[in-house]
Structure formats: C-alpha cells, structure tokens
Amino acid sequence: MSQGAFTVRPLAYGDLPQVMSIERRAFSTPWSLAMFVLEISKPSGVCLAATDALDRVVGYLICARYDTVWHLMNIATEPDLRRHGIARTLLTEMIWRAGTESEYTLEVRTSNAAAIALYQQFGFRSAGTRPRYYRDNGEDAMIMWRTAPTATTGAAG
C-alpha cells in the first residue's frame, strides 16, 4: 500500500534497529527488542512498517489477536514526521488485513488527545479507564473499542 511518500509492508526482523530508534524517541517507557521479536514471531498478528522511498522505517504498528479480538498494542511514527498520515495509513491497513468486521481494542494515555481523536475517526469509542496504567508517571489509560465498522473508517487524511 502506498500513501504519498511512504509505503506500508509487513514488519520484518531486519527493521527492528530502526523500530527501536523510533520507539526510544517516541515513548518514555519503550518496548524492549525482545517484545518486538515476540510479537513479530506470532503468525496470527498484524505487524506493519511504513517506509519511505529509501525503505527507511518511518512508522510501525503491532496488533495481536486474542481469541476473537484484535489488540492494537503499539503504533508509532518518526517524531519529526507526525501528522503526515502515517499512523492513519497504518491503521487503515491493519483494519483491512485483520478484517473490517473484526473487533479491536487498545489502551491510550488519557492525555493523548491527538491519538484519541485519530482512533475515534476509525470508530473506536471509550469503554473506561485503567487507573495508573503507565509505569513512568502513573497516568491512567483510556480503554477504547471498535466493535462495528463506521462510515468514517479510513476517512480523510
């Protein structure tokens, strides 16, 4: 899938050095390399990389399947390239690959208004909070669910 200056493809083990670089700059409590290796090794997951014209990773997404529900576990873009449609395209591709009729869940920091707004555009809705979910500062996580397709899925970029 192409979107302007980037392409989305399956995430590969060879992408992990670039993924780790983005991860460390994007999150105060980054995933470990082992966590990424574990998720990529699961055949049922959807693990995607957004790459630029030189095949450099500019964003990535990890979504795991648990029984009948998909859990969006990690999504990040190169900090300097945020708000360029990368996350939106990764989410669109995830839903296309995992199924438009599937159920999805995720957790997001309650202070992350931009991410919450993006998820809402894809039909995710708040379903409560996980108190003190984030270890770095004890912030709550909003639990969001997407239980049915909506007319705005994958809309405007």
Q: What does each of the following model-derived ranges do?
A:
Residues 6, 10-84, 88-99, 147-156:
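Acetyl-CoA-dependent GNAT
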Residues 70-71, 109-114:
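Ligand-binding grooves and catalytic loops that recognize ribose/phosphate and carbohydrate rings
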Residues 98-108:
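Conserved GNAT acetyl-CoA-binding A-motif
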Residues 1-3:
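Short acidic N-proximal helix/loop "leader" segments that mark the beginning
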Residues 78, 82, 109-111, 136:
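Residue-level recognition of the GNAT/N-acetyltransferase active site
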Residues 87, 91, 112-115, 132-137:
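Short glycine/proline-centered loop/turn elements that form peptide/ligand docking sites
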Residues 105-107, 120, 125-142:
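Conserved catalytic-core motifs of GNAT/GCN5-like acyltransferases
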Residues 18, 117-118:
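Well-formed, non-transmembrane alpha-helical positions, independent of function
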